[in-house]
Regions:
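Local beta-strand N-terminus motif with an aromatic residue
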Residues: 2, 60-61, 89
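A generic alpha-to-beta junction signature in SAM-dependent methyltransferases
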Residues: 20, 64, 85-88
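S-adenosyl-L-methionine
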Residues: 25-66, 71-74
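C-terminal substrate-binding/active-site "lid" region of AdoMet-derived donor-dependent transferases
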Residues: 76-143
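Conserved class I S-adenosyl-L-methionine
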Residues: 2-11, 18
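Redox-cofactor binding/interface segments in oxidoreductases and associated redox assembly factors
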Residues: 7, 65-66, 94
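Short glycine/serine/threonine-rich phosphate/pyrophosphate-binding segments
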Residues: 12-17, 73-77
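Residues at the starts of beta-strands that form the adenosine-phosphate
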Residues: 4, 25, 91
Length: 146
């Protein structure tokens, strides 16, 4: 990938470092502080606000990573809004944070909601953290930013 990546819930900056390793410019979106090594990177812009505040600017992007610590359904709603700024050929990686009870049902509900805006070519529950599911998303044509 090339171009601009958005890192939702970026602090302390793990995903931002990965994205920079692929040569992407990154807007790290989080009210919390970034690791100083990440913050000093000239290819990183730290937006110290919420994802919703940032998206109001309407800047289109090539990649979105969402690792926000919040209710999975709320995070999915935010990804629905983000479909409007993700370029048609773009991709998103999202981590669903699931409560311990009813994980399978909650994961299914979240993916059903995401499928309104995205194709879901891949989803995997991580072995080391059974309460998270990582999902790869591609925007459906009608939602993507042209």
């Amino acid at each position: 990938p090339s171009g601009l990546a958005l890192d939702f819930g970026a602090a302390p900056g793990g995903w931002t470092r990965v994205l920079r390793g692929y040569g992407l410019r990154v807007v790290a979106i989080d009210p919390a502080m970034l690791d100083p090594r990440v913050a000093r990177d000239p290819g990183v812009t730290h937006f110290k606000g919420t994802t919703q505040e940032y998206m109001r600017q309407g800047e289109r992007c090539d990649v979105i990573v969402n690792d926000m610590r919040m209710d999975a359904m709320l995070s999915c709603q935010i990804m629905g809004e983000a479909a409007g700024i993700l370029k048609p050929e773009g991709l998103a990686i999202m981590t669903l944070k699931l409560p311990h009870e009813n994980q399978q049902r909650n994961a299914r509900r979240a993916m059903d909601l995401l499928s309104k805006w995205y194709e879901i070519p891949f989803a995997r529950q991580l072995f080391h953290n059974r309460s998270e599911v990582t999902v790869l998303l591609r925007p459906k044509r009608r939602w993507a930013a042209d």
